[in-house]
């Protein structure tokens, strides 16, 4: 079953996005998304 995880901006730390992730995957998710605080496309990493 999948669980909901938050994505935090790598630069400023803002948590703008949530997504679903399978529980059996141990690698932390990294996606390039738009950050409203930085006003740019940045890497967003899975937050704890």
Curated annotation (Swiss-Prot):
Q: Which Pfam families match?
A: Ribosomal_L33
The record's GO molecular-function terms, alphabetically, read:
structural constituent of ribosome
Q: Which domain of life is it from?
A: Bacteria
Question: Do you know which InterPro entries this protein is assigned to?
Answer: Ribosomal_bL33, Ribosomal_bL33_CS, Ribosomal_bL33_sf, Ribosomal_zn-bd
Q: Which GO terms describe its biological process?
A: translation
The UniProt keyword set, sorted, is: Ribonucleoprotein, Ribosomal protein
Of the GO CC terms on this record, one is: ribonucleoprotein complex
Q: Which family does it belong to?
A: Belongs to the bacterial ribosomal protein bL33 family.
UniProt-recorded name of the protein? Large ribosomal subunit protein bL33A
Gene, per the UniProt record: rpmG1
């Amino acid at each position: 079953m999948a669980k909901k995880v938050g994505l935090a901006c790598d630069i400023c730390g803002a948590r703008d996005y949530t997504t679903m992730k399978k529980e059996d995957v141990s690698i932390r998710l990294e996606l390039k998304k738009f950050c409203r605080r930085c006003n740019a496309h940045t890497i967003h990493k899975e937050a704890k």
